[in-house]
Design a protein with these regions (language model features):
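ATP-dependent carboxylate activation and anion-phosphoryl transfer catalytic cores
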Residues: 2-20, 25-28, 48, 302-388
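Active-site nucleotide/adenylate-binding loops and adjacent lid/helix of ATP-dependent enzymes
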Residues: 2-24, 29-30, 36-40, 53, ...
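Conserved N-proximal alpha/beta basic substrate-recognition cap immediately N-terminal to
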Residues: 18, 32-40, 48, 54-181
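A short glycine-rich, hydrophobically flanked beta-strand micro-motif that places a catalytic Asp/Glu
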Residues: 54, 239, 243, 250-251, ...
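Short acidic-glycine loop/turn motifs at beta-strand connectors
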Residues: 59-62, 100, 256-261, 335-338
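A glycine- and small-aliphatic-rich helix-loop capping segment at beta-alpha/alpha-beta transitions
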Residues: 137-146, 221-226, 363-364
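Phosphate-binding site of ATP-dependent enzymes
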Residues: 220-313, 339-341
Length: 388
């Protein structure tokens, strides 16, 4: 592991002419390294003339530490060990909420360090303990403005089964599936396997509450299904078994509208994979983040005008059905018959240089830096009332 230790970076005095943004990344989930890579992209892109940045890392143990403002040290690379934030044995950092806003206290080499007023928190946490409504709930309790979806949408977007329930209620198609509950597999595995007989092969077995394609397996034969369920259960005890959908993988970036305006939708993009260059059979972790030469981001997607309109309209409907705010990426399968089937909703999509979300907005006319600024400004004007 490449450890990024908190060694006491200097903290600038608050600049009253700038908005103070705490960029929070790392975290306790298995996507810790991906979160650091996302932070690297955002720290490189954020407008330093408008925003004063406090880079705050969360260790895998849950400690909050101030780290050096060095995006290169956070980047994901297949030529070095994964990045991990450490606190070198220090205690817990805290975010407090005095009257009038949030005040951040993190760990220093000699004890707690008060960083002062924070205007906005930009949580770049992927997976559990970050993207699932946990940090959002903490910030809501303290009335601290933050970027992205609220508690409910974050929690629903994290749980693929709950997402399907909400989308189904809105009349939006998803893949046929069977839920393997946390205790059901241990209690009666044969009942689960029998239920899965109604699904069409190949099957995709995935953790219900994880991202970055962690723990996902493609299953071609019934005899391989139990092992695939165990692989997914190692990431999350709640598992989803889905029928494979034959279709092109199309992704859509959605951005909250200003005021009461409708959600804004970027040009759809798609993933083109070259297995001869190291891509897997599907868009797994290695293909997504390490096999850069094997993956091409195509935007606009190579689809017709009717399909484009359908995909964009469905993405906006899905965004609102789940109650998203700020941003989300809606992933589709576009079948040969022209049906748009939602695969998942990602409420904190990756912002790495290899991520499709910022690229789709760039193609649509909103550059990386302006996109980050827009997200921060949306958070600043959003009510901190939990019933907004």
């Amino acid at each position: 592991m490449t450890d990024l230790q908190e060694t006491g970076p200097s903290v600038p005095s608050p600049d009253k002419s700038k908005v103070r943004v705490a960029v929070v990344f790392g975290g306790r989930s298995g996507e810790h390294t991906i979160s650091c890579a996302t932070a690297a992209g955002v720290l490189s892109a954020i407008d330093r003339d408008r925003y004063e940045v406090l880079p705050v890392g969360i260790t895998p143990e849950g400690q909050w530490v101030l780290v050096e403002d060095d995006p290169a040290a956070l980047e994901l690379s297949d030529s070095r060990p994964p990045v991990t934030i450490t606190a070198d044995g220090l205690g817990q950092g805290v975010l407090t909420a005095p009257l009038g806003g949030g005040e951040l206290t993190v760990l220093g080499p000699t004890g707690p360090r008060v960083l002062g007023q924070v205007d906005v928190v930009l949580p770049l946490l992927h997976g559990p303990y970050g993207e699932d409504g946990t940090i959002q709930g903490m910030l809501e309790m303290m009335s601290v403005p933050y970027v992205g979806c609220g508690v409910l949408a974050s929690a629903a977007g994290m749980d693929k089964q709950v997402t399907k329930v909400l989308l189904g209620a809105a009349g939006i198609a998803t893949a046929p599936h069977v839920v393997v509950g946390p205790h059901a597999w241990k209690r009666d595995p044969e009942a689960i396997l029998t239920a899965c007989q109604s699904l069409s092969y190949p099957l995709f077995v995935k953790p219900s509450r994880a991202g970055s394609s962690l723990g996902i397996s493609k299953v071609e034969r019934p005899e391989d299904l139990p092992d695939a369920i165990e692989v997914a259960r190692a990431v999350d005890p709640k598992v989803l078994v889905e029928s494979g959908i034959v279709g092109r993988e199309v992704e859509v970036a959605v951005l909250q509208g200003r005021g009461d305006d409708a959600p804004r939708v970027a040009e759809p993009g798609e993933i083109a994979m070259d297995t001869s260059q190291g891509a897997g059979e599907f868009y797994d972790f290695e293909t997504k983040y390490l096999a850069h030469d094997a993956v091409a981001m195509v935007c606009p997607a190579r689809i017709g005008p009717e399909e484009r309109a359908l995909i964009m309209d469905t993405a906006a409907r899905a965004f609102e059905a789940v109650g998203c705010e700020g941003l989300a990426r809606v992933d589709f399968f576009l079948t040969e018959t022209g049906e748009a089937v939602v695969n998942e909703i990602n409420t904190m999509p990756g912002f790495t240089p290899f991520s499709l979300y910022p690229y789709m907005w760039q193609v649509s006319g909103l550059g990386y830096t302006d996109l980050v600024s827009e997200l921060i400004e949306l958070a600043r004007v959003r009510s901190t009332d939990v019933n907004r």
